[in-house]
């Protein structure tokens, strides 16, 4: 099984690719899709879709896991929701089964405690994937946690 985890955003979209082979989880790749604040919003959304398409074509995941939000209050959050919609559309274009998880469920799945802090999540991700240095930037590490949640809760 190969899964892509995605941490949605407009400025930075984190992604993480993990293989699960006979119960062992192996980090294949992680990183970010970054857009510039000087671009028009529609240009940023197109860039996210195009870059995500390239990542999907390169790594050919079997499924996807995406962070899900419940509250939309600020204009910044609305932009993130728009980016998330583009991400969902792009995943759908490749017919990837999509799992969606709220932040508390991701923390619970990865650390065993739904109110864990970022360091606890990061340490759990590093331990599970047997990596010695933290995945950078934080958005990529978060995406790996989302991918692990997709594996644990499949």
Swiss-Prot record:
Coiled-coil residue windows: none
GO cellular component terms listed in the entry, alphabetical order: cytoplasm; Holliday junction resolvase complex
Protein residues bound to Mg(2+) 2: 67
Cofactor(s) for this UniProt protein: Mg(2+)
Binding residues annotated for Mg(2+) 1, in chain numbering: 7, 139
Cofactor note: Binds 2 Mg(2+) ion per subunit.
Gene Ontology process terms (BP): DNA recombination; DNA repair
EC category name: hydrolase
Superkingdom assignment: Bacteria
Active site (record annotation): 7, 67, 139
EC id: 3.1.21.10
Protein localization: Cytoplasm
NCBIfam families: PRK00039.2-1 (NF000711), ruvC (TIGR00228)
Description of how the protein assembles with itself and partners: Homodimer which binds Holliday junction (HJ) DNA. The HJ becomes 2-fold symmetrical on binding to RuvC with unstacked arms; it has a different conformation from HJ DNA in complex with RuvA. In the full resolvosome a probable DNA-RuvA(4)-RuvB(12)-RuvC(2) complex forms which resolves the HJ.
Recorded family membership: Belongs to the RuvC family.
Function of the molecule: The RuvA-RuvB-RuvC complex processes Holliday junction (HJ) DNA during genetic recombination and DNA repair. Endonuclease that resolves HJ intermediates. Cleaves cruciform DNA by making single-stranded nicks across the HJ at symmetrical positions within the homologous arms, yielding a 5'-phosphate and a 3'-hydroxyl group; requires a central core of homology in the junction. The consensus cleavage sequence is 5'-(A/T)TT(C/G)-3'. Cleavage occurs on the 3'-side of the TT dinucleotide at the point of strand exchange.
Protein name per UniProt: Crossover junction endodeoxyribonuclease RuvC
Species for this entry: Prochlorococcus marinus (strain NATL2A)
Gene behind the chain: ruvC
